[in-house]
Amino acid sequence: MHLRRLMRMERSVPEKYEGLWRRRIIIRRDGTSDSTTDVWWFQSPSYSIDLRVPVSSTAGQKTAFAGVTIQSTSAEGEILEWRPDIAFPGISDEVDAGYVTLNTPDELHERGLDGSYDEDWYKVENGEMTSSRSVDGDLFNFVIEGSIWKAVAKGRPTDSYFGHEEDQSKWTEVSVYRKSEDTTEWRLVASTIELSFLH
């Protein structure tokens, strides 16, 4: 029998980075850029949920993760590092970290530690957000919810899209919802999982 544990974590990220961020553009060192991919970065005091959905993407082209966020400082500036507990299409061995600068309270610039990319982000109104992270055996569950937007992530560290393209039970779910303007119901906006599998 597995016990479901609600994880109470100390703050690891300054309050100024909390909230829902949307990416405006990424510019890569090779000169290519992307301003059309839908990206949602939900940041709580200690962990984050991130979903990226390219325009007209297939399932395997989406990327997402949920896990702990760590802030540190170097001579180059403040650093945020994202350490996924679960991810889609799978957990990578690569370090995910960047130098971050707030140009205004609602405008953030991120630069890769190796200079391989620059990203511009803007904060989206989402009211006061609540968050939870729990573990049931090897199953992680994350929820970050505001007054307008909500993100849910569920999966295992061993989940992988590759080799299981037709078996969504082996995929980590990361879903973004928006509250309908005329009701209190949450409407699914985007997910790593197909809608038919979620219901």
Model-derived regions: residue spans:
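Lipid interaction determinants
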Residues: H2-A64, S74-H199
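Catalytic phosphate/metal-binding cores of nucleic-acid and nucleotide-processing enzymes, i.e., regions
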Residues: V68
